[in-house]
Amino acid sequence: MKKIVSIALSLIMIISLVACGSSNTKTTDNGSGATEKFVVATNAEFPPYEYKEGQNFLGIDIEIVSTIAEKLGKQLDVLDIAFDSVIPAVTSGKADMGAAGMTITEDRKKSVDFSIPYTKAVQMIIVTEGSAIASVDDLAGKKIGVQQGTTGDLYCTDDFGEENMVRYSKIADGVLPLKNGQIDCLVIDDQVAINVVQNNSGIKTLETAYAEEEYAFAIKKGNQELLDKVNEVINELQSTGKLAEIKAKYIK
């Protein structure tokens, strides 16, 4: 009987370990010794703002939210999910905050509160070398690749029609279709576009920008205490020059 109980307990322990290992979150120790977690939802397919190297999360947003977690006296717990799942994770309470190179929009404001902006961006167009597309005016009737749920997706759908949209879970998945002529261009935030072009030959960004915007962090409506603290940290990072240092580290 003792042997049966021992075997059963061993099986329970194994199942528990497997369950723990299947999580799509990553806890980053901020050195504070805190046990309470600060869960931040992101989509780590958006360099230089958030991306992964091995099991480590890196990027501008990650460094900022690490500082926020430290100021809160909590451990940062990164929840890596699809971009269009970030706001639902915040509104449902699955995450404390969303940090995913997210643009402030009136539609998103209906679901979440936004921190003060911490950076600005513009949408950029990526085309193949030798493409006849020279500006936004040339996109009518073209097949446009976008990352699903991003402002590039929203703007292009409004301006050029649902029938011309080709959506990808990450913008890098659109590079090969672009080169093969399956789509005519990609539209994504400027620093991400530059990163994509730097890592892939035969493509370029157009000098003409398309839509200016501001990034901020998404927080559940009514959580004024967290919103105030996040704004305080952003202001401090800006006033001390630390925010500029973080950006310079990732934007060359």
Please state what every model-predicted region is:
Residues 16-34:
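Bacterial lipoprotein signal-peptidase II cleavage site
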Residues 22-26, 151-168, 201-209, 232-252:
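Ligand-binding clefts/hinges and TM-proximal coupling segments of bilobed small-molecule sensing domains
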Residues 28-32, 127-144:
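Flexible hinge/capping segments at coil-to-helix
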Residues 77-90, 131, 148-151, 166-180, ...:
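Short helix-initiation/N-cap motifs at beta->coil->alpha
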